[in-house]
Amino acid sequence: MADTDDEHASPQNPDNRIELERQAADEAHKAKILAHPPEGPGGDPLHPPVTPRPGATRVVRDRKGGRRVVEVPSTGHSWDGIEEYDNPLPRWWLWTFYATIVWGVLYLIAYPAIPLVNGATQGLLGQNYRSDVAAEIQRFNEANAPIQAKLVETPLEEIAADPELANYTANAGAAIFRTWCAQCHGSGAGGATGYPSLLDNDWLWGGTLEEIHTTVMHGIRDPKDADTRYSEMPRFGIDGLLENAQISQVVNHVLELGGLPHDAALAAEGVEVFADNCSSCHAEDGTGDRAQGAPDLTDAVWLYGSDPATITRIVRDGPFGVMPAWTGRLSEADIVAVAAYVHSLGGGE
C-alpha cells in the first residue's frame, strides 16, 4: 500500500504533474508581484490593493495526447476586479465558423443572392422563386377550376343547399376573408370602430346573400366603381347647416331614440331639428333606411360610438366610410365565395 501511495505522489503521475505545474505557475506569479509591488495605501506588497492579474494558466493537450500548463495572457481589460483573458476559441467553434463561411460562398454562387437594379443574380442552379409561386398558383387554379365554374353558374340562393359548394365556400371564403377583409372587419369579423361587425343582424345596406354579394362587388363610396353603393351624410356643423345649439338638441334627441342618458329638454327641442334635417335618411322614428345605408338609431349598435361627444362629432363633421369594390381585384368565384362565407357567419338574412 505504501508503494501505491508513493506512486500516486510521484511527479511521474500525469495528474500530479499538472498540479505541480499549476503550483509553479502560481509561485512565479507571486514572485512577479513581490518583485514589482503595485502602489497603494500602506505600500504592503503582501496585501496590495485589488489589481488586474497579468495572466492566468490553463491546461492544454498537445498533438501526442499529453497535457501541459500554459500561461494565458490578459487582454488588459478589467472591470471591478474581473479580468478578460485572451483564451483562444475552441477548435470546434472555429471549424464551424469556417464551414459557415464556405457554405455562404457556395450559396451565393448557387442561388439567387445579389440584388440588381431589375432583379437579382440567378445563381448556377437558376432557381426562380417567383416562377415557383406562379406555377403553384396555376396548379391550384386548375385543380379548383371545375368547382369554381359550378359556383359561378349556381344561383346564389341554391349554394347553401349544395354540400360540395357549401363546403368550398366555407373554406375558400374564409381564406379570402382573412386575406382581404380581416384588416378592417377583424379576423373574427367582429368589426371595430368605423368598421361594422358582420356577426350580428344589423346591416347598413342589407344582409341577404344577394345584397352582401352586391356590396362586395361594388363596394361603398368607391370612386372607381360606377355602381358603388353611395350615400353621404351632410356635415351639419362644418358647412354651417346647423348652429351649435341645434346640434346639441339633435344629439340629445338621438340619445333619446337609442335609450341612452340625455337632457330631456334639449331632446324635446331636437325633435323638430331631426325631422327637418335627418328624417329623410334615418326615418322619422330613427329606424334608418337600408336603401341609403342610413343606420338604425334606435338599437344598441353604434358604428362610431354612442357617447355624446362622438355623436356630436358625427353630426358636425359627417362620416364618410369607404369600402373598396372587389370587382377586378377578386375573381367572380372568389367574390361569390366570400359573400357566401360572410352570409353564413350568423347575421345573414
Curated annotation (Swiss-Prot):
Residues 1-67 are annotated as: Disordered. Residues 16-30 have a biased composition (Basic and acidic residues). One of its GO terms (cellular component) is plasma membrane. Its cofactor is heme c. C-type cytochrome. Part of the cbb3-type cytochrome c oxidase complex. CcoP subunit is required for transferring electrons from donor cytochrome c via its heme groups to CcoO subunit. From there, electrons are shuttled to the catalytic binuclear center of CcoN subunit where oxygen reduction takes place. The complex also functions as a proton pump. Component of the cbb3-type cytochrome c oxidase at least composed of CcoN, CcoO, CcoQ and CcoP. This is Cbb3-type cytochrome c oxidase subunit CcoP. It comes from Paracoccus denitrificans (strain Pd 1222). The gene is ccoP.
